[in-house]
């Protein structure tokens, strides 16, 4: 397991899982990827937070944020989701037909209504969730090795010498799959 030097900030450190409506693979689309990147930067500029780790998969996002003291992550996710949805439609994106209750609330079929959050409580908790983020594309069968997935902070952590490039690489015959059993109740997947 990598050796993390810093894991929390003043307002808390949180792991999030954000899922698209009905698990639509919206983020297979490069336009959606770019819109999400743009919207996150916009929201960060007005409502600062630090992204410690993130992975973008076709139908969901996992990330770890450091929050400012006494601040609100729900506001940030609401803004990210709503701004993304507006820009997604403005750029020709579509949504999925939604239930009557969603229609009554003027909700679109882009995001699941809520998100999953977990307060990181220790260095070990941080490390396990960060490992989960970086291993997630392998878990879902998109790649054999974390370094093969470009939509992840794994590469930044390798560059900073926190992870070796061949970390949990399934190309390595001696590599054991990680066990995330002890955090399964905190990942929301």
Segments predicted by a language model, with ranges:
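Short catalytic/metal-binding and nucleic-acid-binding patches
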Residues: 1-189
């Amino acid at each position: 397991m990598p050796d993390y030097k810093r894991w929390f900030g003043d307002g808390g450190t949180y792991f999030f899982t954000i899922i698209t409506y009905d698990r639509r693979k919206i983020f297979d689309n490069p336009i959606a990827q770019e819109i999400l990147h743009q919207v996150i930067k916009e929201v960060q500029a007005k409502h600062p937070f630090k992204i410690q780790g993130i992975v973008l998969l076709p139908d969901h996002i996992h990330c770890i944020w450091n929050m400012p003291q006494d601040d609100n992550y729900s506001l940030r996710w609401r803004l990210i989701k709503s701004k993304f949805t507006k820009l997604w439609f403005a750029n020709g994106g579509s949504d999925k037909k939604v239930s009557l209750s969603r229609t009554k609330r003027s909700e679109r079929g882009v995001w699941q209504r809520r998100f999953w959050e977990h307060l990181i409580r220790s260095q070990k908790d941080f490390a396990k969730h960060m490992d989960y983020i970086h291993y997630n594309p392998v878990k879902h069968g998109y790649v054999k090795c974390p370094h093969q997935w470009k939509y992840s902070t794994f590469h930044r952590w390798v560059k900073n010498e926190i992870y070796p490039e061949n970390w949990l690489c399934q190309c390595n015959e001696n590599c054991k799959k990680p066990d995330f059993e002890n955090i399964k109740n905190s990942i929301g997947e």
